[in-house]
Amino acid sequence: MELNFTKMHGLGNDFVFVDDFNKSIELSADQIAFLCDRHFGIGADGVILVRPSDRPECVAYMHYINSDGSLAEMCGNGVRCFTKYLVDHNYIDADAGSYIADTKRGPLPISFKLDANGLMSVASVDMDMPILDPEKIPTLLPASCTTNGESFVNEEVVPSPWGDLSFTCVSMGNPHAVCFLDNLDQLPAEWFTSSDKTLNSFDLERFGAYFESHKAFPAKTNVEFIVPADDGLHMRVFERGCGETLACGTGACASLVAAVLTGRSARTNKVHLRGGTLNITWQENNRVLMTGPAMQVFTGTIEI
């Protein structure tokens, strides 16, 4: 079967987009893995099928599949790219400036801006309210604090073979375990892949893979490691179902929420990822706003 596709990315978090408005495409886990393979396929962190929505207020439905074939509840960078795809392919009037996207989590209001060439370049996504209830995240870690009457998991210690780490848990439609590395120079040398103790040299592959599948997270989890700084929150992420990515929109939102809950950040801040920067605001109405770029890389046809 020949498949027409569009390769897109949001801060290096990249996706293979396939138009499935006829709802005629079903891809196996092996086919997804092939499309996402960076040596034998197109190369991506996941595949997004653009499908019609059953909701009259929504333009289209974003069906997101991780590179390992598992379904994802939500993807912040993906939904910005989804917006660009809809604008570029005339599913949305470029002058409209806003629309409502349908996702597995539900409808999300999105606004977007055009660049000097009339192309959509930046989108602001209303990512809905963070979920803090441990049972709904889900996590088996206990809630030890409350905010506005809602209990949340506040820096609970989780053991590992190499030492204990503390996690604050947030769901943005998908589960996140956020770990703050406040004093890198005080951490054990064996936690790093080089002699310089920086976020970039932190052994994310080892710790991310371990905690992603830890028994404390029955549905597995995305794992964020954060270094707070004067210029914002510096973040690396190990995504559930695909490993480290250059950026994670829901992870940036969850990390900002966790930083506010633990007193490390104001309600608006920049989150610096390996692929670039997102602007995140946890609004007073409890909804999280994410703003960042979306880019098309190339289009093509592939035999699967």
Where are these predicted regions, by residue range?
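Membrane helix-loop-helix hairpins that form the core translocation module of multi-pass transporters
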Residues: M120-P130
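Active-site donor-nucleotide binding/catalytic segment of nucleotide-sugar enzymes
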Residues: V170-M172, M290
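A glycine-rich beta-to-alpha transition motif near the start of alpha/beta enzyme domains, typified by
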Residues: M1-S121, V178-I304
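Selected transmembrane alpha-helices and immediately adjacent juxtamembrane segments
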Residues: F167, P175-V178
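Extended Gly/Ser/Thr-rich low-complexity repeat segments
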Residues: E135-T146, T299-I304
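Short, charged/polar, Gly/Pro-enriched secondary-structure boundary elements
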Residues: I131-E135, L187
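N-terminal, positively charged, Ser/Thr/Ala/Gly-biased leader segments
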Residues: M1-S24, T139, A143-V170
